[in-house]
Structure formats: structure tokens, C-alpha cells
């Protein structure tokens, strides 16, 4: 960690000319005179690529961006990502592509790690709620994780509960491998409002449907309402977020596959981003 910070400091102070970094670390580099970026692998979306490439040329002088992209079997990629299949179908397709060992198979591996499935997530959320116990009092609960996978699953469940207004805040301590969670007393109307606000900001066209489902949950046994609310948010995440990220990944793959000329890529990016802005406004009006 100390070495990483030192390398970044030397790069930003022009005492080093090259920096190799992960996407997350590289996005934190604010330096106006970067002349060249080299992207290994597929960006998660065209928007992400636009932001990552934007690390270079901030002083308005010429900067060059290159992407190294590998795809063994375009037909397999299209079969996996071009349709609107469910997550089980995608998992089977990704399994067949593992031996390709290309950027597409690696991108699918990370995507599927981020989305384990609705049944798995609902079960994990149920386990977390059991550990939290009584939701009628304000309290602080400590969770411990063993490895990166268990941390990811646990943190994902806690974030879902936070979006439901059940968890007030959470803090991760990596050195002790603990997550400290502040719980607010459960209030259905507060959770309802929290979810409505989240949907209104992210997917306003779906708000009416979500509100109808919230009305149904309100009629259920109060002790089961937190789980029902979390299940609702998990279903929404997979129906909207997972499918959206899958589609964005495919669009990034098509960009890498079909365009190599500077002007073509630049025009494609501009058209794509402008279309996205227009689509967002239409969705808000729907």
C-alpha cells in the first residue's frame, strides 16, 4: 500500500513517466498532462471507458488512448449477451466460454461474481436479518468476514438493507475484518419512503409498479415485512441493474470488436452518449 502511494506521488509530480494501476486506483489520479492511456481488457461500459480515457489530455493538448481487447469466439459472445435471457442461461453460456481465457470470459466471470442470483441473495439477506435480531430498537451490530467472497456477499446484503431504510449506516474495518452496522428501529413507512425515493431517482418509469408491490407488502405480517422489502429490492436489482450492466458490457464489447479507426470510435462515443442522455430524459417523462 505504501509503495502504491509512493508510485502515484512520483507520477503526479512528474518524477515518473509510467504508472500501472487498477481502474479504481487509476481513476483517482488527477494529473493534467497525461499523454497516453492503455486499457487492458474490456471496460464495464462505454460510459466507464469514456471516464477512464478522460484521465488523459486534461490540459487540452493531444493525448492518445489505446485499448487491448481479446475475443476468441464472437458467436459465443453474441449468444451469451445479445438476447434477454435469464441469469441461469448466462451462467451456462459463461461456463462454456471459460476455456477461451479471453477478455470476454473474464468480464463475464466478474459480472457473475457481482450477481450471484436472486435466491442466493434473498437467503443471504435472511441470514443477516436473523443475526441482527430484534428490529424494534436502535443498536449497533458487528459482522465478521473471513475472505473476499464472504465480505462481498455480506456487504451486498447489508447494502440492500440500507436501501430499504432498515440499516442506518455501515462501516468496514479491513484490518479487523469487521463490518459495524447501525440499525434504526424498523418503521414500514420510513422504509417505504426510502425505497420510493431510490426508485424515483434511478428508474422513475417503474415507480408505479414498485408502489403497488409496497402496498401489498404493507398488508403482510409486520415481522416478515423487512424480508419482503429486501426481496423486493433484490428483484428490482436483477430485473433492472443486472440486465442493464449486462447490456452495457455487450455494447463495450461491440465497440472493441467493430471499431478501430480513431474517427469512428470518437463518433460512436459521441452518438452513444448523446442518445443515452435523450433516453434518460424520455424515461423520466414516462
Protein language model annotation of sequence segments:
Residues 1-25, 29-286:
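C-terminal helicase lobe
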Amino acid at each position: 500500500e505504501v509503495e502504491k502511494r509512493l508510485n502515484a506521488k512520483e507520477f503526479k509530480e512528474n518524477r515518473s513517466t509510467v504508472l500501472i494501476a487498477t481502474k479504481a486506483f487509476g481513476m483517482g489520479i488527477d494529473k493534467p498532462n497525461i499523454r497516453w492511456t492503455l486499457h487492458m481488457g474490456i471496460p464495464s461500459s462505454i460510459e466507464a471507458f469514456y471516464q477512464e480515457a478522460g484521465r488523459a489530455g486534461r490540459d487540452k493538448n493531444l493525448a492518445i488512448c489505446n485499448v487491448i481487447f481479446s475475443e476468441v469466439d464472437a458467436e459465443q459472445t453474441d449468444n451469451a449477451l445479445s438476447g434477454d435471457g435469464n441469469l441461469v442461461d448466462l451462467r451456462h453460456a459463461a461456463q462454456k466460454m471459460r476455456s477461451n481465457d479471453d477478455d470476454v470470459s473474464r468480464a463475464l466471470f466478474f459480472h457473475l461474481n457481482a450477481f450471484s442470483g436472486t435466491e442466493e441473495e434473498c437467503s443471504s439477506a435472511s441470514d443477516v436479518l436473523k443475526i441482527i435480531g430484534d428490529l424494534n430498537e436502535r443498536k449497533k451490530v458487528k459482522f465478521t468476514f473471513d475472505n473476499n467472497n464472504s465480505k462481498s456477499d455480506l456487504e451486498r446484503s447489508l447494502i440492500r438493507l440500507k436501501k430499504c431504510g432498515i440499516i442506518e449506516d455501515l462501516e468496514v474495518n479491513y484490518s479487523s475484518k469487521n463490518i459495524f452496522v447501525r440499525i434504526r428501529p424498523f418503521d414500514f413507512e420510513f422504509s417505504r419512503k426510502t425505497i420510493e425515493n431510490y426508485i424515483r431517482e434511478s428508474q422513475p418509469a417503474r415507480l408505479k409498479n414498485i408502489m403497488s408491490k409496497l402496498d401489498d407488502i404493507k398488508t403482510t405480517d409486520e415481522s416478515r415485512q423487512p424480508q419482503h422489502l429486501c426481496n423486493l429490492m433484490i428483484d428490482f436489482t436483477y430485473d433492472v441493474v443486472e440486465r442493464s450492466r449486462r447490456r452495457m458490457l455487450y455494447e463495450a464489447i461491440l465497440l472493441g470488436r467493430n471499431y478501430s479507426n480513431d474517427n469512428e470510435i470518437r463518433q460512436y462515443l459521441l452518438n452513444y452518449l448523446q442518445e443515452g442522455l435523450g433516453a434518460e430524459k424520455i424515461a423520466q417523462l414516462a
